[in-house]
Every structure is written in C-alpha cells, then in structure tokens.
From Swiss-Prot:
Signal peptide: none annotated. The gene is gatD. The lineage of its organism: Bacteria, Pseudomonadati, Pseudomonadota, Gammaproteobacteria, Enterobacterales. Transmembrane segments: none annotated. Its EC number is 1.1.1.251. GO terms for biological process: galactitol catabolic process. CDD domains: sugar_DH. InterPro entries: ADH-like_C (IPR013149), ADH-like_N (IPR013154), ADH_Zn_CS (IPR002328), GroES-like_sf (IPR011032), NAD(P)-bd_dom_sf (IPR036291), PKS_ER (IPR020843), Zn_alcohol_dh (IPR050129). PANTHER family: L-THREONINE 3-DEHYDROGENASE (PTHR43401:SF2). Belongs to the zinc-containing alcohol dehydrogenase family. This is Galactitol 1-phosphate 5-dehydrogenase. Keywords: Galactitol metabolism, Metal-binding, NAD, Oxidoreductase, Zinc. It comes from Escherichia coli (strain K12). Zn(2+) 2 binds at residues 89, 92, 95, 103.
Length: 346
C-alpha cells in the first residue's frame, strides 16, 4: 500500500509498504477514504516534533471497515467509521473517572504511532466511531476537529443562550463558530487578523467580526458592551497575544476556554492578571476532545450536526489530492501559511 511518510527536517515522501494485518481480537482494519492535515501536524513535520521518525502522521480520517478481529461483533466490512485517535489505558484512576485526556499512559494515532496518511490502517475497535449511513464519508474526516470546539463547550456547560466569542478563525475556530450557531448561542463574534477568514466566519453565522490587526482591545470591548454578560470566549489561535486579548475584552464573570496550544511563552503583566481577578473570570483549560462515556457526547453531537447538515465544510477545504499531490501540498506549507484543510484522498 502507499503512505505519506515524514522523515526529520521536513522531508515528506510517498512510500510503499505491506497492508497491515489484524493481530489482536479487538482490532479493525480501515480502508481510508479521507484524511486531513491538522495544524498540530506541522511541528511534527517541519520542526522535528514527532515522537519518532520515519512516521506516518494523520489523526483526522474516515473510511470503511475492511476487516475485523474475532472479538469485534458490532462492526462489519463496509461500515463507515471515523478515527478516534486517543488511546487511553482505561484502567488508571484518571481514566476510571472519565478523564481520558489526562491519562499518563495514553497512545495516540498519528503521533505516538503511525496514522492515517495511508491506504489502510489497523486500530483498536475503541479508536473508531461508527458513522451514520447517510453521512458523506469525507465529512467523517472532520468529526475529530469539530469535537475540539465542542469539548470546550462541554466543559463550559454548553453555549446555548451565551454570547460566544471565538478568537482565531482557523479550521477549529470556524467549525466552533458554526457549532455555536447551531447549538443556540445568543450571539457569535469572530476575531482574527485575516479579512478573508472573517468574511467566511460571517457567512457561517457570526453576528459580527473584529480584525484584531485593525482594532484595539478597548475598541472591541466598547462594541461588545451590550454583549458583555454571559460570555463564553474560546481562544483557538494559540499565541500569547490572543490569550491576552481574550482577558482584555472579556466581560464580567465571563468564561474563557483556552483551546489553542501555545508554542511560545506567555508573560502576563500584573495589570492583565489583575483583570482575571477583578472581572472574576472563569478560565477553562480545554485539552483534546474526550469525555465519559467514551469517546464522549462531543462525538455524538458532531455526528448529529453533520447529519442534520448544520455545518458547511466545503469552504474550509483548500486542497484534495492523492498521495503525490497531497505530499506536495504539505511541502508547500513550509513556504506558505496553511491555506485551509488539506485532504488526502487515497
């Protein structure tokens, strides 16, 4: 079979290997139909951030069951599934409480083991989520990134009737905007530095948009004055400036969910830190996208929203291609910003 393999120093190549075999009774083999490049893959590709090399990345994928182990009786060849990439131990105290993202002995498809940039993959039954028969198979590759924002909503006890502010209009942010609209947010505001992304956010239902390269935090806060209560802010950009911005614009008693992963140190001034106290903000750390019962209500909600056609995915896709085309699109990101979702279609 073919796969896209990463070596150190940003080398991306297409390789041939044997189709993997099922070795354990709780495993399934998936013939991959669509696999998406995640922003978290970029440090693994270009900054030697993977756990080992060579490695096949890819944790956002969907496909069809090709074979099942003897212990799997609820899935059959031809069934459509999406990847659930985290593999916690399920036995430690954290897992027994349903805190799967805090498992210290976890494995992860496409990071700590080879992933879905390939024609086939063998994974545990627990690592696939059954898709409805009427869902387009490509949509299934978006379930994992959709659940990232939904997990933040879950930790905040929902977004219904709240004034939701999404900072960062990348794929995660744009999906979260659509989910907030679909789940009954009172208002949705999008903040980014790209006018193109903000226009997309507006088309997805954002009531208003702020370009943070053109507006100051006090200006944004002034516009948000009538929406200052019952706020839920999602910081999805993952840069120190946007974390500080979130604190600056937050209304009293706002919830602030930190979703984006920082790759630079964050240094808060005493004045900014003081605003967390004075506004009595609730700061929520949001890590991955799992809850109990496994893999979590987030996954059921994502599936439902897709089935109900509440989410628009096509505008998020920048590139579709088979192995060589996909590999070249990945290489191109070294010279240009990631333009949107890049999909491998084996």
């Amino acid at each position: 079979m073919k796969s896209v393999v990463n070596d150190t120093d940003g080398i991306v190549r297409v390789a041939e290997s044997v189709i993997p075999e099922i070795k354990h009774q709780d495993e399934v083999r998936v013939k991959i139909a669509s696999s998406g490049l995640c922003g978290s893959d970029l440090p693994r590709i270009f900054k030697n951030g993977a756990h080992y090399y060579p490695i096949t990345l890819g944790h956002e994928f969907s496909g069809y069951i090709d074979a099942v182990g003897s212990g799997v009786d609820d899935l059959h060849p031809g069934d459509a599934v999406a990847c659930v990439p985290l593999l916690p131990c399920f036995t430690c105290p954290e897992c027994l409480k349903g805190f799967y993202s805090q498992c210290a002995k976890y494995d992860f498809i496409g990071s700590r083991r080879d992933g879905g940039f390939a024609e086939y993959i063998v994974v545990k039954r627990k690592n696939v989520f059954a898709l409805p028969t009427d869902m387009p198979i490509e949509d299934g590759a978006f379930i994992e990134p959709i659940t990232v924002g939904l997990h933040a909503f879950h930790l905040a006890q929902g977004c219904e009737n709240k004034n939701v502010i999404i900072i960062g209009a990348g794929t995660i942010g744009l999906l979260a905007i659509q989910c907030a609209v679909a789940l009954g947010a009172k208002s949705v505001t999008a903040i980014d530095i790209s006018s193109e992304k903000l226009a997309l956010a507006k088309s997805f239902g954002a009531m208003q948009t702020f370009n943070s390269s053109e507006m100051s935090a006090p200006q944004m806060q002034s516009v948000l004055r009538e929406l200052r209560f019952n706020q839920l802010i999602l910081e999805t950009a993952g840069v120190p400036q946007t974390v500080e911005l979130a604190v600056e614009i937050a209304g009293p008693h706002a919830q602030l969910a930190l979703v984006g992963t920082l790759h630079q140190d964050l240094h808060l001034t005493s004045a900014t830190f003081g605003k967390i106290l004075r506004k009595e903000l609730t700061v929520i750390g949001s890590w991955m996208n799992y809850s109990s019962p496994w893999p979590g209500q987030e996954w059921e909600t994502a599936s439902r929203l897709l089935t109900e056609r509440k989410l628009s995915l096509e505008p998020l896709i920048a590139h579709r291609g088979s192995f060589e085309s996909f590999a070249q699109a990945v290489r191109d990101i070294a010279r240009n910003a990631m333009p949107g979702k890049v999909l491998l279609i084996p």
